[in-house]
């Protein structure tokens, strides 16, 4: 079965393929962040959001994986085989867990739409040849102000007039109006 853990959140595994494995913080740092920011909601018996539930599940999966890794470490006598298992878990499973934790913590911190925009913006940025892209990659925490990929609709901020258009210092002349048109 090919299950995409991001599908119900509007993302996909492919969106993460543009982010290097060293982009994601360590599992320990992510767990510390989740605990510091969302401990009450994660430990609450009440349902908060789908992101909280998914984050809870990812944390539980990591705990089970660490239990298995400890068992393997204690019971597998061949050091080469033990190293292979530990390396596989850290490289493959560790990356998947780090991606999941990062995604759900980021959604809770910045909002799902912002995180999705970031993933799309970064994917566009990284695929654009260096000669044609801005020098700096999109940054998640500043994305709403700097993103190139915008949602349809009006921009929430007002645009200021172009600095090239200077207004005259003299008062503006008004056309004379007929008395009938003044209300």
From Swiss-Prot:
Query: What InterPro entries does its record include?
Result: Hepatitis_core, Viral_capsid_core_dom_sf_HBV
Q: Where is the composition biased (Basic residues)?
A: 149-176
Keywords in alphabetical order, please.
Capsid protein, Cytoplasmic inwards viral transport, DNA-binding, Host cytoplasm, Host-virus interaction, Microtubular inwards viral transport, Phosphoprotein, Repeat, RNA-binding, T=4 icosahedral capsid protein, Viral penetration into host nucleus, Virion, Virus entry into host cell
Modification Phosphoserine, positions: 155, 162, 170
Q: Name one GO cellular component term.
A: T=4 icosahedral viral capsid
RNA binding: annotated span? 177-183
Compartments where found? Virion; Host cytoplasm
Chain spans, region 3 X 8 AA repeats of S-P-R-R-R-[PR]-S-Q = 155-177
Positions of the UniProt region annotated as Disordered? 136-183
One Pfam family from the record: Hepatitis_core
- Repeat positions for sequence: 155-161, 162-169, 170-177
Query: GO annotations under biological process?
Result: microtubule-dependent intracellular transport of viral material towards nucleus; symbiont entry into host cell; viral penetration into host nucleus
GO MF entries: DNA binding; RNA binding; structural molecule activity
PTM section of the record: Phosphorylated by host SRPK1, SRPK2, and maybe protein kinase C or GAPDH. Phosphorylation is critical for pregenomic RNA packaging. Protein kinase C phosphorylation is stimulated by HBx protein and may play a role in transport of the viral genome to the nucleus at the late step during the viral replication cycle.
Question: In which residues does the motif Bipartite nuclear localization signal occur?
Answer: 158-175
Its domain of life reads: Viruses
Q: What is its main location?
A: virion
- What family does the entry list? Belongs to the orthohepadnavirus core antigen family.
**So what does this one do?**
Self assembles to form an icosahedral capsid. Most capsids appear to be large particles with an icosahedral symmetry of T=4 and consist of 240 copies of capsid protein, though a fraction forms smaller T=3 particles consisting of 180 capsid proteins. Entering capsids are transported along microtubules to the nucleus. Phosphorylation of the capsid is thought to induce exposure of nuclear localization signal in the C-terminal portion of the capsid protein that allows binding to the nuclear pore complex via the importin (karyopherin-) alpha and beta.
- How does the annotation summarize its subunit structure? Homodimerizes, then multimerizes. Interacts with cytosol exposed regions of viral L glycoprotein present in the reticulum-to-Golgi compartment. Interacts with human FLNB. Phosphorylated form interacts with host importin alpha; this interaction depends on the exposure of the NLS, which itself depends upon genome maturation and/or phosphorylation of the capsid protein. Interacts with host NUP153.
Name assigned to this protein: Capsid protein
Q: Which organism is it from?
A: Hepatitis B virus genotype F2 subtype adw4q (isolate Senegal/9203) (HBV-F)
């Amino acid at each position: 079965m090919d299950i995409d853990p991001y599908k119900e959140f509007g993302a996909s595994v492919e969106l993460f393929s543009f982010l290097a494995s060293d982009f994601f913080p360590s599992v320990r740092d992510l767990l510390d962040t989740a605990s510091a920011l969302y401990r009450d909601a994660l430990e609450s018996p009440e349902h908060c959001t789908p992101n909280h539930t998914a984050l809870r599940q990812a944390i539980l999966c990591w705990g089970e994986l660490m239990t298995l890794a400890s068992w393997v470490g204690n019971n597998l006598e061949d050091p080469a085989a033990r190293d292979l298992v530990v390396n596989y878990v850290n490289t493959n499973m560790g990356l998947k867990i780090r991606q999941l934790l990062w995604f759900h913590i980021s959604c809770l911190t910045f909002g799902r739409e912002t995180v999705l925009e970031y993933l799309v913006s970064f994917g566009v940025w990284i695929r654009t040849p260096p000669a044609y892209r801005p020098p700096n990659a999109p940054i998640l925490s500043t994305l709403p102000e700097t993103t190139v990929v915008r949602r349809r609709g009006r921009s929430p901020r007002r645009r200021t007039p172009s600095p090239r258009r200077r207004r005259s210092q003299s008062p503006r002349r008004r056309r004379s109006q007929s008395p009938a048109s003044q209300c």
